[in-house]
Amino acid sequence: MSFVTAAPEMLATAAQNVANIGTSLSAANATAAASTTSVLAAGADEVSQAIARLFSDYATHYQSLNAQAAAFHHSFVQTLNAAGGAYSSAEAANASAQALEQNLLAVINAPAQALFGRPLIGNGANGTAASPNGGDGGILYGNGGNGFSQTTAGVAGGAGGSAGLIGNGGNGGAGGAGAAGGAGGAGGWLLGNGGAGGPGGPTDVPAGTGGAGGAGGDAPLIGWGGNGGPGGFAAFGNGGAGGNGGASGSLFGVGGAGGVGGSSEDVGGTGGAGGAGRGLFLGLGGDGGAGGTSNNNGGDGGAGGTAGGRLFSLGGDGGNGGAGTAIGSNAGDGGAGGDSSALIGYAQGGSGGLGGFGESTGGDGGLGGAGAVLIGTGVGGFGGLGGGSNGTGGAGGAGGTGATLIGLGAGGGGGIGGFAVNVGNGVGGLGGQGGQGAALIGLGAGGAGGAGGATVVGLGGNGGDGGDGGGLFSIGVGGDGGNAGNGAMPANGGNGGNAGVIANGSFAPSFVGFGGNGGNGVNGGTGGSGGILFGANGANGPS
């Protein structure tokens, strides 16, 4: 019943009020009893006598019922008084127990506070104007204190305090005008999440830059990395960069997300990078933060966090590029996906972020991250889609490389080029190239090239080339080339990938393999070459 509250003093007051009501009613009933229970007959006739007896009997019954009501009223008052007393006793007992607990903690914490400057058990104090950094949590248990959020221009926010053995790191404080946010505190050595970075301070100074977001705190063993703080807004200059996400615990956890770049009049801030996913068996990188929007040039997205689990790893996705909103503006590029690695099992690189929309030029899609594994499946991340535009669409990002020593290496697909909507002068973005798939023993498959960006009336984007795939003792499969983007003016299809891999700057063909098909276009892409001993070349794309 933790949701029930009681105020003993209010119960005592209510009991007294109810008792006073009962006293008043008893006095009134006693006054009325004499005149109502003995009613004189109006005359000597039988009818008058009967009426008098009726009223007298009614009054007598009323007095009997009133006596029962008075007894119930008295019992109710006693119950209220008893309940108030019980609650008062319970509060006194609880207060005594709490005092005992506080006294016990004080005895336990005093030596540790004197020796190490922090308690054994308890949360760290929040930062203040005089001491902006949050205090560290208890050595055994407790969260770090939050950093102080500054109100003075140019002064950075306070850092969050670190946790002890178990607990979460404190959040960083917000920076003053134009100043950086405070870093998040580290999580507990055994268990706990890192604190979030503080927001960067905004600025309205001409040509000024918003404050950078604070970095998220790391999680040492088990826990999530803290998210990076957002960059500060700039009314007349450049937005602040987003803070980087904190790393996950080395045993288990997820890297923190990068902070969003600050928006601005001139150039949007770059998004923060995602935190590393460094779990022993499972590694999950944090996503990069989005770039800030701007009237002129949007900010680039932050890179996804790397991942390094021993059995399973996923790199974080890159952040999306910020939009450019005014006429003649350019958008930010998407951030690259995080690389991923594993010993035995599965590793996949993060996808590249989407390019932002720009009035003049769309942002390019981010590169897909690499996925590499010793034995198992390594998959490259997908390239990000190019950003749309009223002028020229952004290029799709290239797919990441997928590699393995023994198993399957699959390259990521290239991103689709950005669309262009300006009637008559629009140019679709180029499709991204497919990633290379490499395997020493097994199967290497290149990623498909991205399709070119479409346009309403103008030049469509060329399709991206397919990635090469293969290896020394593996079957190689080249990725298909991307199709040309739709448009009134001609565009070319991408070439198919070859059966083989590029190593040390030179192409090494596979003994067995199949080339990828060329993409469709006014000039169809050329099919990729097959294996030198067995296989087939890819078909040329139709024109």
From Swiss-Prot:
Protein name: Uncharacterized PE-PGRS family protein PE_PGRS44
Family: Belongs to the mycobacterial PE family. PGRS subfamily.
Region (Disordered): 194-214
Disulfide bonds: none
Signal peptide (residue range): none
UniProt domain PE: residue ranges: 1-93
Source organism, top-level taxon: Bacteria
Pfam family, one: PE
Organism field: Mycobacterium tuberculosis (strain CDC 1551 / Oshkosh)
InterPro entries membership: PE-PGRS_N, PGRS_rpt
